[in-house]
Amino acid sequence: MRISVIIPAYNAADTIGACLESVVDGAHEVIVVDDGSTDGTADAVREAFPEVIVLQQSNQGVSAARNAGMDAATGDYFAFVDADDRLFPVALREASAFAEETGPDLLVLRILSDREEHYPWEGRFRPDRDYDKKDIVEEGYLRGSVCGCLFKRDYIRRQALRFPEGISMAEDTLFFNAAVAGEGRIRFRDIRFYHVIERPGSASRSYDEAFFRRLSAALFRAPEMIPDEALCTQVRLSIILSITSHALEQHRSPGWARETTGLDQALPLPVRGLKKGRTMVRLLNASYPLLYRLVQLKKTLTTRG
């Protein structure tokens, strides 16, 4: 059983060496997709890691790079790694052994930085049983990254799943939940798999109007990618809450957020099938300004606490 590790890279010559040191083990396929780098990323990989497959394309974004990697991959499972992050030691060995033993369509592992765990699931899902999309909806589990997961190649191709090109935010959220929305078997396993490397300035971002428009683009792409109505509503609600939170941080009004993102065109969100978040969705459908004030109140209480 072999995993295809797909690494999109753009001007990553300074970081991709350490990334590949943690990934290349001789047992699995590693594909680096150079997305139009100008710093010699592809040459650096070829020189230091001749066993790695290097694809080059014009700069088209991370979604297009991942799609190119999936098209070229021959492994039984896909794993996605960013060029400035790493895998934990023996992570591939442990994950591939469990995937070979249980054969899930989607295997969710652990993703950690030095400070915290990202998208924790312990206490919500057990590692000794299968789950499906109904379980994910009932638990209200949302994940904003495809990293730290294994996706079965045959399942992804059977579902004709692709990363959404043409948007530059929340593409991971859409792909992960599109995979969940199929009729696949989902497993969770307590394996320290993916190591997020935090760097100075990595959390900084410009929250200008273009940022909000990019984020809202995912809001409108979600229905075409996630056919399950309840799951799609959960994803769209999470995007709207993210828009609201960032608008508050920038001292923007609810009217500004609605106009800039075209939010009214996405409403109302359906509530059928929801187990968690029904009240929040109903509040949103009734009055976005009220939802905005609720989020504002929660942020204020959290800050004071």
What do the predicted segments below correspond to?
Residues 22, 34-43, 58:
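A conserved acidic beta->alpha catalytic loop
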Residues 192-199, 205-234, 238, 242, ...:
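Catalytic core of nucleotide-sugar-dependent glycosyltransferases
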